[in-house]
Amino acid sequence: LIAERPGRIRLFREGRLSTYAELPVYHRGESGLLGLALHPRFPEAPYVYAYRTVAEGGLRNQVVRLRHLGERGVLDRVVLDGIPARPHGLHSGGRIAFGPDGMLYVTTGEVYERELAQDLASLGGKILRLTPEGEPAPGNPFLGRRGARPEVYSLGHRNPQGLAWHPKTGELFSSEHGPSGEQG
């Protein structure tokens, strides 16, 4: 599967490229369709997860789930909503991946509002950790903390764009990008 930022998901199979799904997105700057992940038990659990920016009902980022139906995907439900987005479309984060623990990890940017990255009541500037159903994952560090979003796994991020796990230790690595030197 290939994600295209304007909202199209393409299926490349046996040398052929076809449209798998088309999702409505707000596509400006770095926003749009930004990440895809297969359920860790795919195809037994026939779900594809996507991170997108939407404008309908208020501008925001969200994680949605599609049901895999052979050659196409059909929007099944919203897994997580209310991730900050701004009209400029910058610093939306948007990488999603299932970790070795079977949980869904979601990167979110601080949308050029640096204070969001340290605000535990905001989903912006974080790495989130969810169950495949979209609930806060057991063992998240801020579960039960008053005023904190229980989905938060890591905070203080500018615009994380990559996720990977060490193959032996399972340690999570996240990559971010930006200009060199002092960020002041």
Where are these regions (language model features)?
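Acidic, Gly/Ser/Thr-rich repeat motifs that build Ca2+-stabilized beta-propeller blades
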Residues: 1-115, 162-184
